[in-house]
Regions:
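A general structural motif
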Residues: 1-2, 27, 56, 95, ...
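Hydrophobic, well-ordered beta-alpha structural blocks that scaffold small-molecule cofactor pockets
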Residues: 1-49, 53
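Short glycine-rich loop/turn motifs that provide flexible caps or phosphate-binding loops at active sites
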Residues: 7-10, 63, 143
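Generic structural signal for conserved hydrophobic packing positions in ordered secondary structure
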Residues: 8, 59, 78, 125-126
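Short alpha-helical
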Residues: 11-12, 66-68, 124
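Phosphate-bearing ligand-interacting subdomains
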Residues: 17, 36-89
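Structural signal for interior beta-strand "rungs" in well-ordered beta-sheet cores
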Residues: 80-152
Length: 152
C-alpha cells in the first residue's frame, strides 16, 4: 500500500490528492487543524498538523500560505509530486515538497526550490531560478533567465 499524508484539507489539498492518485498512491489521508473538517476529496481527515511526524507514509504540505507551508515542511520529510500531464525538461531540478500541476511546462536548466507550487497551466522557461516556497500562479508565464526569490 502506497500511503500519502496530505497536510492541509482545502482546495489545494484536493488537487494534490488527484495528482497523488495519478502517481500511484492508493491510501490518502489528510491532516488539518480545523476539527470540523472530517473529509476532504472523499478521503478522511485523521488529525491535526502537529501529528505529521507520528503518522506513517509519504508526506506533502498542501497549504497555500508560503510561511505556514515552510514552517510545517521544515519539521518533516516531504515528497515532490508532479502531474503526469506536466511537460518537464530532463534538465530541471525540483526541490523537496514541491508540487507541479497539470498542464505546466518547465523548460531546460530550471531550478525550483523546496516547497514550491507550480500551478495549473503555468510555464517556466529556460535557465530560471525559483526560490524556496514560491507559488507560480495558475496560467502564469515566467520568461527565460528570470530569478524569483523565496516566499513569493
Amino acid at each position: 500500500m502506497n500511503r500519502l499524508v496530505i497536510i492541509g484539507a482545502s482546495g489545494h489539498g484536493k488537487v494534490i490528492a488527484d495528482i497523488a492518485i495519478k502517481n500511484g498512491y492508493d491510501n490518502i489521508v489528510f491532516l488539518d487543524d480545523d476539527k470540523h473538517i472530517k473529509m476532504c476529496a472523499g478521503f478522511p481527515v485523521i488529525g491535526g498538523t502537529c501529528e505529521a511526524e507520528k503518522i506513517a507514509g509519504d508526506k506533502i504540505v498542501a497549504i497555500g500560505n508560503a510561511e505556514i507551508r515552510e514552517k510545517i515542511q521544515s519539521g518533516i520529510e516531504t515528497v515532490t509530486l508532479i502531474h503526469p500531464n506536466a511537460v518537464i525538461s530532463r534538465r530541471v531540478r525540483i526541490g523537496k515538497g514541491s508540487v507541479v500541476m497539470a498542464g505546466t511546462v518547465i523548460n531546460s536548466d530550471v531550478t525550483i526550490g523546496d516547497g514550491c507550487i507550480i500551478n495549473t497551466g503555468a510555464s517556466v522557461d529556460h535557465d530560471c531560478k525559483i526560490g524556496q516556497y514560491t507559488h507560480i500562479s495558475v496560467g502564469a508565464h515566467v520568461a527565460g533567465t528570470c530569478e524569483i526569490g523565496s516566499n513569493v
